[in-house]
């Protein structure tokens, strides 16, 4: 049997064995893909460790979140402009008669106070032993003799003023009251020869004695009511009867 016909087959087997041992599958696919086929991929291995955090990304657009809960009520706002007045309502029914209070409660507090004040003034008037009333004035005296300044102070103490006749009737009442010459509430202390009352008003009534006022001695700044009802100017430092007038 001849060996030559089997020689080519033997050489081919040797080349194939040698190539399979030295060449990888990847290289074989590159060099001889049509001849040698690689086997199927192996099983996946275990997951590796987490990598490091990447760089911070850019801010995203606002998302559409869920609607939140209703918040608490806000502060009370300023009052609005007043509205127009409404039309008058219907007339109500007639009420029952009220009950009048009894005794002292029938007087309001202001009325009681006024009454108490008036009673206090009357008590002061009663401290004088004599008095005359003309119209809405009381002319009263306690019979004391004193200077003009003391007469003014006495009358002020009793919430009164020095007697100042405004007409013949008042002048006559004071004349009938006195038994001594009395000071009147009239002076020319501020302007010589210009007699005024103690509030500074010019006189609208006078009843000067003949030849008066004459300012004898250059210091007669006060006025005296004589027993005959006429007036005379005298020094304010002299002492005479005190007569006060009280408005009523």
Swiss-Prot record:
Residues 43-113 are annotated as: Disordered. Its main location: secreted. Pfam families: Collagen, Lectin_C. It is found in: Secreted. Residues 134-245 form the C-type lectin domain. GO terms for molecular function: D-mannose binding. The coiled-coil domain mediates trimerization. GO terms for biological process: complement activation, classical pathway; complement activation, lectin pathway; positive regulation of phagocytosis; surfactant homeostasis. Residues 112-130 form a coiled coil. This is Mannose-binding protein C. Residues 42-99 form the Collagen-like domain. Residues 75-87 have a biased composition (Pro residues). It comes from the Eukaryota. Hydroxylation on proline residues within the sequence motif, GXPG, is most likely to be 4-hydroxy as this fits the requirement for 4-hydroxylation in vertebrates. The gene is MBL2. GO terms for cellular component: collagen trimer; extracellular space; multivesicular body. The modification 4-hydroxyproline is found at residues 47, 73, 79, 82, 88. PANTHER family: MANNOSE-BINDING PROTEIN C, PULMONARY SURFACTANT-ASSOCIATED PROTEIN A.
